Amino acid sequence: NVRDIKPGELGMKTFLDMAWDIDKFDFDNINNHQVDFLVSIFGERYREDIEDVMNSYYHLGFQHKPEAMGWGYEWNNEHVQERMTDTDFSFINYNEAEGRIQEYDRISDKSEKIWNALPESHKAAFYELVFYPVKGAALMNKKMLVAQQNRWYARQGRTATNYLADRVKSYHDSIDYYTDKYN
């Protein structure tokens, strides 16, 4: 059982096209393949925005995949519960965490603008191929990074910890909402 192919459809299309004719691909054009496919569905007028969104999405994902943002989980240990540890993205040095959140917000907003502008007949496909992966990655990063910031604030005894905890819960609930629409 290979499960649902929906989340792997775009990558599978690229892989199968490469298997069919590898000579069409090289270092300079590989990034354009998915954009060309998406533009063939959603329209040439969205090329620049789709290219920007997808390039940033893959760049951020290469730095760290959103589904592994909780990479500090300690499994099978002496603790009663698994413990979440902080990511390597810093809130102190070079605005790493904030910059990551801002970039995900930027591409998430851009993908939502495209989705809103599309005709109804194209919205489901765009939601599956672009909007949901980008929005989900943005929300997962925000959830995990704001939780990290919350733990930092709690160690300092700041009263803002309750506010941050509410934001984390909101991001979690938003992931559930968008996932329900995706499925």
Go through the PLM ranges and name each one.
Residues 32-183:
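Catalytic domains of carbohydrate-active enzymes that cleave complex glycans
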